[in-house]
A protein has these predicted regions:
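Interdomain boundary/hinge segments at the C-termini of tandem beta-sandwich modules
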Residues: 137-141
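Solvent-exposed loop segments of extracellular immunoglobulin-like
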Residues: 50-58
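Surface-exposed, short loops/turns at beta-strand junctions within beta-sandwich domains
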Residues: 102-108
Length: 142
């Protein structure tokens, strides 16, 4: 008597993809903002990511300010990089605080650059590696 044993393995044609988060907007509180205010900015994700490891967020603030009376100078302030593990630690909306200088002239431009280390390819065929997203708003001052 011959005994046959078969091993059935489940196979799927479904592929595993990394999904890069997408920011819908940056919210500013309080609103309206006046020079000298301490503000909190939140980059809202309308699509969460998936299969992402190391993540870093770089925030910058660009504005003009008064010096020597009426003249203005342009400057950009770069905040320290915020690092996390997106899937392992936190996929929460990125948040940063900033004190608006009392001598600001005009509006404040806020930029967030997010860098993601992908654990799989993306559906568009991008292979493992890094992807990034940039979002920017202008905060109107009163």
């Amino acid at each position: 008597m011959t005994m046959c044993c078969g091993l059935w393995m489940g196979c799927s044609n479904d592929e595993v993809y990394s999904i890069v988060p997408h920011f819908s907007k940056i919210e500013c509180q309080p609103n309206p903002v006046t020079p000298g205010d301490s503000i909190t900015l939140t980059a809202r994700q309308d699509q969460l990511g998936k299969l992402i490891n190391a993540t870093s967020y770089d925030w910058s603030f660009t504005y003009s300010y008064f010096y020597d009376g009426a003249a203005t100078k342009d400057t950009t302030v770069y905040m320290p990089t915020v690092k996390t593990n997106y899937d392992g630690i936190s996929n929460a909306d990125p948040v940063i605080g900033f004190w608006v200088p009392a001598n600001i002239a005009g509006n404040l431009t806020v930029t967030i650059n997010a860098f993601y280390s992908l654990s799989a390819q993306t559906s568009s065929g991008q292979l493992y590696g890094q992807a990034n997203r940039t979002n920017q708003i202008t905060v109107n001052l009163q």
